[in-house]
A protein has these predicted regions:
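Short beta-strand-to-loop capping motifs
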Residues: 8, 68-76, 125-131, 200-206
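N-terminal ordered "arm"
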Residues: 11-39
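N-terminal, Lys/Arg- and Ser/Thr-rich interaction peptides
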Residues: 1-6
Length: 263
């Protein structure tokens, strides 16, 4: 048997589709291209498909991953078995617009699961004031400088305590250790009401930190829009790498049509 790791995007209107529904889309795509998936044993066998970290509904991503197990050998040269290099194009043609395979690679036996292995994610999003929020500093000429100062304050702090709600219960967490990087990118428009693009690398252990929690640290009156996950990172020998490129750095295949189909 062979295991193959696939990178894919989730862009456009399909970002409102749940993680479970996206999983069903993939199962249908695998059937359409007639991939020989391995199945679990038992009364109700299921295809051996393992997804990485769930993407919150409403968020986009250009760095989603899943692993599949095949009952036949997967090859990089296409001379026998499954031609992995051709998989992204075949799968993208069988998937709805907005979900596209962008790379595929055979992974080595014993490779940790995505759920276990991903240590952090990079996110980009727009920060804007919540409707009705009182943010006097945001409407001044120095709003960009003020936001930059708040980002610097978070990065220089030894502790960043925020309150979040989980299942109706308020929880208090120190999230500073989970913020690897945080930076301002550029205004999202000519007017402050359009917001500011931010980018951050946030850890996934002991739990996954979200951009919304970072905004609470900057100002509770801010909210996120246009959230996109741009990278997932694993650690190898003290260095971070992308999950798919770790096994065979030179063998990744790309599907440049992905962004076009989602637009």
């Amino acid at each position: 048997m062979s295991k193959v790791r696939i990178r894919f995007v989730k862009l456009g209107k399909i970002r409102w589709t749940s993680h479970r529904d996206v999983a069903r889309m993939w199962e249908r795509a695998f059937r359409r291209v007639e991939l020989p998936l391995a199945y679990s044993a038992g009364f109700s066998p299921r295809p051996k498909v393992s997804f990485g970290l769930a993407l919150p509904t409403g968020h986009e991503s250009v760095a989603e991953y899943l692993d599949i197990e095949l009952v036949t050998e997967a090859q990089l040269d296409g001379e026998s078995g499954i031609d992995v290099r051709a998989l992204p194009g075949r799968l993208s043609a069988a998937l709805p617009s907005g979900v596209d395979a962008t790379a595929a690679e055979v992974i080595a036996p014993g490779t940790p699961s995505l759920q276990e292995d991903v240590a952090s994610c990079t996110w980009r999003w727009v920060a804007v004031p919540k409707e009705g929020a009182d943010l006097p500093w945001w409407s001044t000429d120095s709003w960009e400088a003020e936001l930059s100062a708040r980002v610097s304050a978070v990065l220089s702090a030894s502790s960043v305590v925020v309150t979040r709600t989980r299942k109706g219960e308020e929880l208090t967490d120190d999230i500073r250790a989970g913020i690897v990087t945080l930076e301002l990118l550029e205004p999202a428009g000519l007017d402050p009401s359009h917001g500011m693009w931010l980018q951050a690398e946030l850890t996934c252990w002991p739990r996954t930190l979200r951009p919304s929690e970072v905004l609470v640290a900057l100002d509770p009156g801010l909210e996120e829009r246009h959230v996109r996950r741009t990278h997932q990172w694993i650690l190898r020998d003290g260095a971070r790498r992308e999950p798919l490129l770790e096994a065979y750095p030179s063998g990744a295949t790309d599907a440049p049509h992905a962004l076009e189909r989602a637009s």
